[in-house]
């Protein structure tokens, strides 16, 4: 099946005090989701199950992200999660704390019929 990107949306999330990379990633994905709309699917007669949703998240410690928590946020289509090194850790040496910032991109792919 050939696909074409219909939506690319970005988001940012953070965890201020817990150094929780999953929490920051979830917030980044939710932020991106709140900026997008799929109302056009009904007009084009495209079933949500046909979509491919690529979720890309960047944090400083990708191995610390629970992919299943991110995947559970997406309620449509075939979901693919990619976590890479990115985002930002802001260290506060005086307080002994780290602010975790995650970035996310959601890419919704539509099926395209070849003529």
Predicted regions and their residues:
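Short, charge-rich amphipathic segments
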Residues: 1-9, 91-93, 98
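Short glycine-rich, basic-tinged beta-strand/loop micro-motifs
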Residues: 46-60
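C-terminal edge-of-domain segments
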Residues: 76-115
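A generic local secondary-structure boundary/capping motif
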Residues: 43-45, 70-71, 90-97
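A generic structural signal for short, non-catalytic loop/turn and secondary-structure boundary residues
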Residues: 1, 46-50, 74-76, 99-101
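Conserved mixed alpha/beta catalytic, RNA-binding, or beta-rich assembly cores of soluble enzyme
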Residues: 2-45, 60-65, 105-115
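Short, hydrophobic/π-rich interface segment
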Residues: 57-86
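Broad gene-expression machinery/nucleic-acid interaction feature
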Residues: 5-7, 50-54, 101-105
């Amino acid at each position: 099946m050939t696909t074409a990107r219909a939506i690319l949306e970005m988001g940012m999330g953070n965890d201020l005090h817990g150094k929780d990379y999953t929490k920051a990633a979830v917030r980044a994905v939710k932020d991106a989701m709140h900026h997008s709309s799929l109302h056009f699917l009904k007009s084009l007669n495209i079933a949500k199950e046909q979509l491919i949703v690529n979720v890309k998240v960047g944090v400083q410690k990708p191995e610390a992200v629970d992919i299943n928590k991110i995947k559970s946020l997406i309620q449509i289509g075939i979901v693919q999660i990619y976590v890479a090194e990115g985002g930002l850790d802001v260290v506060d040496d005086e307080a002994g704390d780290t602010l975790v910032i995650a970035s996310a991109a959601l890419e919704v792919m539509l099926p395209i019929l070849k003529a």
